[in-house]
Each structure stands twice: as structure tokens, then as C-alpha cells.
């Protein structure tokens, strides 16, 4: 009787293996592969105090994180917040509706409209701090990267809290070494186990991503959109097609779930299996696409785009295309190409200032920090000056900074300057936006007088006068710009245009950061001036070691459709540039997803079908 009381009956569903996707000749395009995953099951008694439960879970997850990373693997990264290039928290989603859907999920709200204005306006950092408080994590004692990993795991567990005995994946596709280390330490890792999961794989993914899409865990919004009959077949832990063929044919590819009923003891160990129903595999899908033709067409299109870029590339740092009467004579200044390495994050500017930075990185960073201090000082001086020059009298560079502050930062990014409140026919608005006869200082002070400024986004301070509000705006701007990676990119753009940061330095960093395999002769030549940066870049584009999709210079995208004239079958449907859907499937790489969403070359946009292939948009 005593043993019986310590046993708990549990039922767990077992997903069916997803069907494969083949081309017209039976060549595999998407398949499944068994791999080890680190999982955790919440077996902490429900009557445990929240503080004690948080400590147990956090200690366990900290140990898991150490084991996983010591063996060269990584924990899940599918949370809606990532670290930007300056190491600050930012939302992975750039689409406002998707961002608010994530914020609503964090706050346990079924609908976006249920959020308060304060909740809607929370920054990514505030969301992280809110969750840290909920999870008992002290964010002041750890760096942002560690906190984000812990929040990733705790949040994933929280999504399964509606069913206590549901396991949560903490790390997928881990090595044998990680699996062995977890098993060796299992006695001290409460609820942690190694499972063998079926992971989705896409060989040659970049060529087919725009067609195939990818899989991932179903979202609350996707689940809510299902019919009542469909909800009987799906649960919130299911892996589903998120876009492309994977999404359209999800009901075909999905297998039928199996079910296992068993008893566990108070330590969560299985003591007896009561019943078991085997899962059934999903159906395979065959496409009219010819895999080899698809790959060949993709490569042909990439070569063609590279050829056009090279034909337009000019060995000048700055260039005004408006002077050309015929667009066919417009050139691509090499300065734009050098800038693309930073603007499109081919190289990582946050590494420039690290203690282990290489020579070219250090030199560029020193130039940048001096420039940033000068520009911030000049900007704040103009914003504080009632008699500052009118916008039209500023230099092209200073205009770019003012545009960024007003249009990008205050309007689009933060919403401090409320676009929906601005009166387009207002005389002062016209003077700023069209005639360019006033300064940003005068414009913002006028915006305050017209109640176009949302002071709730400046912090918790109360403002009793227009002067205090303007001071609050300036203080906010000064602090924000210090950590704003997009503003940093704009600074680098003008450093490169002026030659203060050289093309040779940028090209050398490509080797220093491992974007291309180290070539000592070329690298040293770039540093000492014996290798011409323009010639180096020309060669790398010509040989496609640096691609049009990476540089995102115009043209950088295109599409090819090949059909069989007899049957009408689509044999190839190429959209360039593609993306690696393996990094989005299973457990999404949120940082990579954000790079794709913000990339100037728009890899999610299907250039054949003319729509955005990502499910989030």
C-alpha cells in the first residue's frame, strides 16, 4: 500500500515521424534524423514554495548549461529576445504585430488587446527583467548572454506548464560527449534526461528554402487559428510546418501520435508501463521540382548577379548617382561595398572592441570610438541650441544623423514621436519635413507643444513643463545612442566614405573574424598596403567567395522559374538569395532569424511568387 501511494500514473504522447519531401526523381529535399536532445521534466512537487522551486530549477539549468557548453554544444535559442551587436537586448521580431504577440504571450494574455499600454511599451530589457523576477534570477550578478540563456530555458519550460509531465527540450542535436556527461550527472540533475528525437534536416537547404520553408513548435496564435477538429490532432508542444511546403502540406506530412501510459515513483523514474500505442509515420510528398536543375539555376542566377555587380563596381569611396541622366550608367562605389560588410553583418562590429581583438579590428575600433564621441558631442550641442542651423544648411552627414534620430529612432523604433498624431498640413511640420527651413531642436520643441510626444516612453519621471519634457527627450537620446548598434552602423558608413576606416582594414577583418579562411599573404598584404583592397574585393565577388546576397548591393536578388512546356510542371522555382532553413527548423536560432528579417537582400521574400515566405509576416 505504501509503494502504491508513491506511484503516479502518467500518459505521454509520442509524435509520429514526419513524412519526407522528394523531388520528381526521388531525390530527398527534406528528411528526418535521429539525434540526442537534453530534456527536462518538472517533477518538483506542486506544493513547493515558489522561491524554493526557482532555486532548484535555476541550479539545475545552470549545471545543464555548463555541461552542454563545456562539450561544445549550445542550449536552445528560440526566445523572442536576442542580443544585438552591442550586447544589448532586442526583440527578434521587427514586425510590430508579431512583437506584441510575443509580449502578450510573456504576460499570459490571450489577445494583444488585453495588454496595457505599459506592457505594450516594454523594451526587450524590461521584458527580460520582468521574467528574471518571475524566475528568481538575479540579472545584476551575471552578464546578459548568461541571463538570456537561462531565460530561454525557463520560458520554454513555462510554455509546457499546462501539462506538468510534458518534457521540455533544453538542447537539441547534442554530441555523444554531452549526452554521456548528462547521464553521468543525472542523479544531481532533477528531471533532466537524454532523449532521442527526430530532427528535420534539409540537405542543400539554401537552394530550396523559399519553396520548402521550415518546421518549428506551434505558436499559441497558430493553435488558436485551428478548427475544432484540427485541435483534436494538435497540441501546443507539436512541431508543425511554419512556412512553404512544410506548412501547406502539414496535415499530409504529420504522422499520427502514439500514446504511452505508465507509472513513475516520487523521483520520476518509470516503474511500470500500463499500455502503449505506436505512432504512425506521416506521408511523403513528391514535388515536380528537379533538384539538380534547381541547384544549377540558383548558381547561375548568383553568377549573373555577381557579374552585374562587378560591371557596376567603381573604385571610388563616395558617389552621387543623382548626377547620372541615364540609370544604366549608375555605378556602385566600392565604399558602399566595404560598408556592406558592417551594415549587413558579414563581419561583427561588436568584436572590434574586445580584449582579444586583432590588429585591423583594434585600429578600426580606435577610429570609431573617437568619431562617435565627436559626433555625439556635436549632435547634443545642436539639439540643445535654440539657434541651431536649419536642416537644409547641415552637411550631408549631419543630415543623415538628424534623419536617423527623428524618423528612425523617435518615430519607428521607440514611438516617442507619435506618427499618427502628426498633422501633415501643419506649417511647422512642412517647414521641417518639406522646406527644411528649421532645426530639429525647433521641430521637437514644437512637437512637444502639440502633444506629439509620448512621455510615457521616456521613463517613470513626471514632467511638469515643456522644458522638462525636452530635457527628458535629450537625456533619453544621449543614453540610447551610446548603445544603439544601428546608429553605430551609420557612423561606420561615413567613416568608410571619408576613408577614415579603409577598405584594406575591412577586408583584413574578413580574415581576422574567419569569414574566409586565413590567407596569410593576402592578410599581411592588406595590412601593409601591398595588396589592393579593391582588387581583393573584386576577386572575391568574381569567385563568389563573397556573394551578392551577402553584400546586398543593387542588384542582389532575383528569381528563376523553369517549366516543362509539355506538361506545365514547374521544374525549378529559384528565389535568390536563399537561407539555411536548418537553422530555423526544430529549435529556431533566433539571432539568425533576426538577421534574415532585417537583411537588406530580403531572403524571406520569394522573388518568384512575390510574397514573404516567412510565417511571421
Residue locations for each model-derived region?
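Short hydrophobic alpha-helical segments used for membrane anchoring or interfacial signaling
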Residues: 560-565
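Flexible glycine/proline-enriched surface loops and loop-helix/loop-strand junctions
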Residues: 278-282, 602-610
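Surface-exposed intrinsically disordered loops and tails
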Residues: 318-328, 594-606
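A short, polar/charged loop-to-alpha-helix boundary motif
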Residues: 38-47, 578-599
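Membrane-proximal periplasmic segments of bacterial cell-envelope enzymes
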Residues: 1-541, 545-559, 578
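Conserved small/polar residues in nucleotide/adenosyl-binding loops
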Residues: 611-616
Amino acid at each position: 500500500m505504501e509503494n502504491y501511494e508513491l506511484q503516479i500514473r502518467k500518459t505521454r504522447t509520442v509524435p509520429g515521424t514526419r513524412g519526407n519531401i522528394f523531388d520528381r526523381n526521388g531525390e530527398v529535399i527534406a528528411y528526418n534524423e535521429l539525434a540526442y536532445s537534453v530534456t527536462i521534466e518538472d517533477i518538483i512537487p506542486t506544493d513547493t514554495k515558489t522561491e524554493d522551486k526557482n532555486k532548484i530549477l535555476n541550479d539545475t539549468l545552470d549545471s545543464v548549461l555548463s555541461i552542454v557548453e563545456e562539450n561544445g554544444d549550445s542550449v536552445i535559442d528560440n526566445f523572442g529576445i536576442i542580443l544585438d551587436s552591442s550586447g544589448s537586448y532586442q526583440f527578434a521580431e521587427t514586425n510590430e504585430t508579431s512583437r506584441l504577440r510575443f509580449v502578450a504571450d510573456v504576460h499570459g494574455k490571450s489577445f494583444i488587446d488585453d495588454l496595457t499600454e505599459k506592457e505594450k511599451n516594454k523594451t526587450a530589457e524590461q521584458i527580460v527583467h520582468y521574467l528574471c523576477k518571475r524566475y528568481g534570477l538575479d540579472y545584476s550578478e551575471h552578464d546578459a548572454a548568461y541571463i538570456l540563456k537561462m531565460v530561454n530555458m525557463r520560458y520554454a519550460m513555462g510554455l509546457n506548464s499546462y501539462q506538468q509531465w510534458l518534457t521540455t527540450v533544453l538542447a537539441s542535436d547534442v554530441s555523444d560527449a554531452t549526452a554521456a556527461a548528462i547521464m553521468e550527472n543525472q542523479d544531481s540533475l532533477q528531471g533532466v534526461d537524454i532523449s532521442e528525437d527526430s530532427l528535420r534536416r534539409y540537405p542543400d537547404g539554401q537552394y530550396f528554402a523559399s519553396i520548402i520553408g521550415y518546421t518549428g513548435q506551434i505558436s499559441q496564435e497558430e493553435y488558436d487559428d485551428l478548427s475544432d477538429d484540427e485541435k483534436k490532432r494538435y497540441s501546443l508542444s507539436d512541431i508543425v510546418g511554419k512556412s512553404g511546403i512544410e506548412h501547406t502540406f502539414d496535415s499530409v506530412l504529420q504522422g499520427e501520435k502514439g500514446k504511452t501510459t505508465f507509472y513513475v515513483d516520487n523521483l520520476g523514474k518509470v516503474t511500470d508501463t500500463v499500455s502503449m500505442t505506436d505512432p504512425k509515420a506521416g506521408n511523403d510528398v513528391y514535388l515536380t521540382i528537379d533538384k539538380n536543375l534547381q541547384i544549377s539555376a540558383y548558381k547561375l542566377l548568383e553568377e549573373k548577379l555577381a557579374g552585374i555587380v562587378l560591371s557596376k563596381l567603381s573604385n571610388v569611396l563616395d558617389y552621387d548617382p543623382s548626377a547620372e541622366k541615364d540609370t544604366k550608367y549608375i555605378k556602385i562605389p566600392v565604399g558602399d561595398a566595404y560598408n556592406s560588410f558592417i551594415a549587413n553583418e558579414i563581419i561583427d562590429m561588436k568584436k572590434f572592441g574586445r580584449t582579444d581583438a586583432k590588429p585591423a579590428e583594434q585600429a578600426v575600433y580606435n577610429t570609431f570610438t573617437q568619431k562617435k564621441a565627436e559626433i555625439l558631442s556635436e549632435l547634443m550641442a545642436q539639439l540643445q541650441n535654440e539657434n541651431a542651423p536649419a536642416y537644409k544648411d547641415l552637411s550631408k552627414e549631419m543630415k543623415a544623423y538628424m534623419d536617423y534620430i527623428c524618423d528612425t529612432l523617435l518615430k519607428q523604433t521607440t514611438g516617442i514621436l507619435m506618427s499618427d498624431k502628426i498633422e501633415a498640413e501643419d506649417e511647422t511640420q512642412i517647414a521641417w519635413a518639406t522646406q527644411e527651413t528649421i532645426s530639429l531642436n525647433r521641430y521637437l520643441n514644437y512637437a512637444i507643444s502639440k502633444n506629439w510626444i509620448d512621455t510615457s516612453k521616456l521613463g517613470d519621471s513626471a514632467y511638469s513643463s515643456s522644458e522638462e519634457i525636452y530635457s527628458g527627450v535629450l537625456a533619453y537620446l544621449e543614453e540610447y545612442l551610446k548603445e544603439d548598434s544601428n546608429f553605430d552602423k551609420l557612423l561606420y558608413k561615413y567613416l568608410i566614405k571619408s576613408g577614415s576606416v579603409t577598405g584594406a582594414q575591412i577586408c583584413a577583418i574578413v580574415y581576422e573574424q574567419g569569414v574566409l579562411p586565413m590567407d596569410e599573404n593576402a592578410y599581411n598584404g592588406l595590412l601593409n598596403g601591398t595588396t589592393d583592397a579593391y582588387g581583393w574585393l573584386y576577386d572575391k565577388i568574381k569567385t563568389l567567395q563573397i556573394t551578392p546576397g551577402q553584400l546586398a548591393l543593387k542588384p542582389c536578388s532575383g528569381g528563376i522559374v523553369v517549366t516543362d512546356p509539355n506538361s506545365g510542371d514547374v521544374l525549378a522555382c529559384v528565389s535568390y538569395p536563399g537561407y539555411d532553413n536548418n537553422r530555423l527548423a526544430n529549435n529556431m536560432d533566433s539571432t539568425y532569424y533576426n538577421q534574415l528579417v532585417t537583411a537588406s537582400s530580403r531572403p524571406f521574400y520569394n522573388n518568384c511568387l512575390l510574397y514573404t515566405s516567412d510565417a511571421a509576416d
